[in-house]
Amino acid sequence: MLDLKYVRANLDAVKTALANRNQETLLAGFEDLEAGRRTVLAEVEELRRKRNEVSGTIAVMKREGKDAADLMADMKEVSGKIKDLESGLKEKEEALNELLMRIPNIPHESVPVGKDENDNVEVKRRGEPRNFDFEPQAHWDIGEGLGILDFERAARITGSRFPLYFGDGALMERALINFMLMTHTTRHGYKEVLPPFIVNRKTMTGTGQLPKFEEDLFKLEGWEYFLIPTAEVPVTNIHAEEILEEEALPLYYTAFTPCFRSEAGSAGKDTRGLIRQHQFNKVEMVKFSHPDNSYDELEGMLQNAETILQELGLPYRVLNLCTGDIGFGAAKTYDLEVWMPQQGVYREISSCSNCEDFQARRANIRFKSKGKKGTSHVHTLNGSGLAVGRSLAAILENYQQADGSVIIPEVLRPFMGGREVIEK
């Protein structure tokens, strides 16, 4: 959530930022609401001033034994007007707050201006795509051929866009989770968290999923509970309504969770395979940072995600997302995209974002500096480290052999009983 004082003082800059996000209409009504609020506030303050002034006069008259009944009657009427105006003022402030809840973050100055994903800027590439001496197969065909993925049975059990792993497929999924968590906790300094997979409305609002994106969420019927779309939601809210000590920053957390997304608006996209699922596993990284250091922390988080891809031996590239493609709560986002040989394209496998104080303001996460008065909002960062199903899909495609078998990346072998290959 943006700071209302900032929006008031920098309205033109906010309008430009929203226009760069293709969201220029979101501020419609703000100026009218703000003008109405100021008018009512001025009336309230004038009546309060009058009430205080006349109250003093009444006190003097009473001390002097004079009749103040008429003034007291007037003040009773003024108090009633103040009460009514204060109620109207509260309504306007709530309307402004509701409007702010639907306005996205302001992009950082280093974010390229662009309309959509076609304007994202490639930062770097790492690893050379493999030259196959046979026609590479899609990961779903490889997995079904090896008997480790079964989308047909998954569809019977639940419906489309759900995975079902067998044998070495389930083992590799678990190996990836363990490898990612071990790397982040033992080498990158994160503390592992196992959070709830169901959260309440306030928690979803704190990280920015609500109120704007409710249709993308799975809601429990009859409850104000939601299945999490990412571990970012519960982990960021660990410190909601808390004041942290400055010396405790930065805080690093990592968590494995299943994630649940309705994929509203994705009809016809990635209908096969593990790329776009209603349920998928992900290892998440979350940081709470001092505002002065948050962009250094973003670069570090990006490196942490890159390490996983490098250790797995998967070719990838890094994109700096443009203003038209960046997420709702992010001030800056790097996407990591892994090479998928069968499609001949890079596909997203991680997003690393600095949300600055946008989420912290919504969730009321602050820190106190030693020797200073007051508190400030922390900066929050989140990143995939990585999406597990997509990592497995990338391994199947990049490590496939002509006979249909798949070589297991060396770093996963200790988690898979020393196995070197998956074969029929």
From Swiss-Prot:
Q: How does it assemble?
A: Homodimer. The tRNA molecule binds across the dimer.
Q: Which UniProt keywords apply?
A: Aminoacyl-tRNA synthetase, ATP-binding, Cytoplasm, Ligase, Nucleotide-binding, Protein biosynthesis
Family matches, as PROSITE patterns = AA_TRNA_LIGASE_II
Known EC number? 6.1.1.11
Q: What does this protein do?
A: Catalyzes the attachment of serine to tRNA(Ser). Is also able to aminoacylate tRNA(Sec) with serine, to form the misacylated tRNA L-seryl-tRNA(Sec), which will be further converted into selenocysteinyl-tRNA(Sec).
The keyword Aminoacyl-tRNA synthetase appears for this protein: yes
Q: Where does ATP bind?
A: R261, S262, E263, E348, I349, S350, S351
Q: Which residues cross the membrane?
A: none
The family annotation for this protein states: Belongs to the class-II aminoacyl-tRNA synthetase family. Type-1 seryl-tRNA synthetase subfamily.
Q: Name one GO molecular function term.
A: serine-tRNA ligase activity
One GO cellular component assignment for this chain's record is: cytoplasm
Which Pfam families would you find in this protein's record? Seryl_tRNA_N, tRNA-synt_2b
Question: Which residues bind L-serine per the record?
Answer: T230, A231, E232, E284, S384
Q: What is this protein called?
A: Serine--tRNA ligase
Pathway recorded for this protein? Aminoacyl-tRNA biosynthesis; selenocysteinyl-tRNA(Sec) biosynthesis; L-seryl-tRNA(Sec) from L-serine and tRNA(Sec): step 1/1
Q: What is known of its domains?
A: Consists of two distinct domains, a catalytic core and a N-terminal extension that is involved in tRNA binding.
Q: What is its main location?
A: cytoplasm
Q: Which SUPFAM superfamilies match?
A: Class II aaRS and biotin synthetases (SSF55681), tRNA-binding arm (SSF46589)
Q: What class of enzyme is it?
A: ligase
Domain of life assignment: Bacteria
Q: Which GO terms describe its biological process?
A: selenocysteine biosynthetic process; seryl-tRNA aminoacylation
Cellular compartments annotated: Cytoplasm
Query: Which reactions is this enzyme annotated as catalysing?
Result: tRNA(Ser) + L-serine + ATP = L-seryl-tRNA(Ser) + AMP + diphosphate + H(+); tRNA(Sec) + L-serine + ATP = L-seryl-tRNA(Sec) + AMP + diphosphate + H(+)
